Amino acid sequence: MSSSSKIDSEKPVMVSESLFSTKTPIKTVKRQIFSSSPKPESVIKLPERFEILEEFFNGLDTAIRLLKLKGSSTTYANICPKIEYLTNRIFSYDHLAQMKHIYPEAIELKRVLKFVEDTCCMKPRLHIKLNTDAIVVEDTICGTKYMELRKVFHSKLVDFRKAHPKDEIPKELLPEPFNSPQRDSYSGIVSVGLGEPKLEVGGFDVHMEEIEQEEQDVNKVIPDSTLSHIESRIVETPVKDLSTPSKDLSTPIRLMSATPTLQLSKRCIELTPEGGDDNSLRSTNSLARGPSRSLNFDTFEEDAIEKDDIGNESDDKGINYEEDGLLQSVKGPSRSLNFDTLEEETIVKDDISNESGDEKSNYEGDNASDDDSLLQSMIERPKTEPEKHNLPQLVNLIHRVFHSTNRTVITKEELLYKIIANQINITDRREVEEQLSLMLQLVPDWISETKASSGDLLVRINKMSTAETVRARLEEATSHDISLIY
């Protein structure tokens, strides 16, 4: 009994040991299969630019899977930071275009519009998707399809490296407006050699090749006589084009030089004594300009002697210039610096300055009535045909300025500025002030001027009156004044 019980007690121990001993080799064999499977594959060394692109593709795969797990949209704006974090490199649209060229079946790009709350506008976004249906895998283990995509992408890089060992990877076109601006749109048409110098403007190279191709086609079809005629016309055309800028360049120079030349010649002709009477050569227009003072550093002693002689002669003549003095008070004196004037012009200017000095003494006591005399001279002065139409046009402009601002009161400075800015043919502020003062007197019930407590002049209009009635009254008043003058 004791021997049989010992045998029975030893059997289960042996069975348990045998069971444990048989399971252990199975696990080791399975681990050896999985660990030894990638060893037979030979890895081909790729250049650095190809390895960087492969890293970007692997990062793209990882970023898209992470965004899907998070529930976020797989747009370029969301994917780019993750790829740059995984690869520690800058990821751009050019890299995406190169990956699209290598594996177009797996990378799907789509342009979508997203509403931006800050700007309340629709902004385009680039949606990126990896198409796992591009490959067929028998094993459906999680992650196998994405790993197979990486292997296929690597094999395609190897194939491209073998076919084009020295070429760069082309860039596939992306949906607009995500194409790189530096990329040449004619890159697929024009091929430039590696040793040839490249132009800075890519479109110019294409344009020159198209012109050469057209010339070759013309040489094949058109006979020699017609071709020579066409070439002569082509040669003549640039000559006309080159002459046009010269005219344009000469025009402002001619205008700029003509204006001072006319003024100087007019003074010399009208005021320079040539053996006759000086009074017969003087005109009221030249005196209306007022005395002009110049600085001449060339002659000092001779000018002083001549000035004394001319001053004595002008005192003996005693010419009355009351009307010219009034015009001079309107226009005011003008001063200029002239370093190259002639001696005759200097003599005439001193003569005018001496005469104007006598006239100033007659009008110094009338400062209180300057405004009244200015307005009276503007009314009594004969108006030409263009000046008759200025006041109605000014009414339209003032009416438009007040209605555009939705105000009935505006400062005089602002009104004058807007009139000069909106009226092309008016450049003189004094002319606008004269017309405005005349209008204040002719139609006071429509436009009036008051002085504010701050000292500014305020102009007010009556918006109840229409512009048509004001123009009619103004035309009637101006025509009546002109008829009285004539």
Curated annotation (Swiss-Prot):
Gene Ontology molecular-function annotations: cyclin-dependent protein serine/threonine kinase activity; DNA binding; DNA polymerase binding
Subcellular compartments: Nucleus
Tissue pattern of expression reads: Expressed in proliferating (e.g. shoot and root apical meristems, organ primordia, guard cells and stomatal lineage) and endoreplicating cells (e.g. developing trichomes).
Compositionally biased, Basic and acidic residues: which spans?
A: 348-363
List all Polar residues biased stretches: 281-294
Q: Which keywords, in A-to-Z order, does the entry hold?
A: Cell cycle, DNA replication, Nucleus
User: Got a GO cellular component term for this one?
Assistant: nucleus
Please indicate if the UniProt record lists Transport as a keyword: no
- Region: Disordered; residue ranges are 273-294, 348-371
What's the main place this protein lives? nucleus
Q: What does this protein do?
A: Member of the pre-replication complex. Regulates endoreduplication. Involved in the coordination of cell and plastid division.
Family classification? Belongs to the Cdt1 family.
Put simply, this protein is called CDT1-like protein b
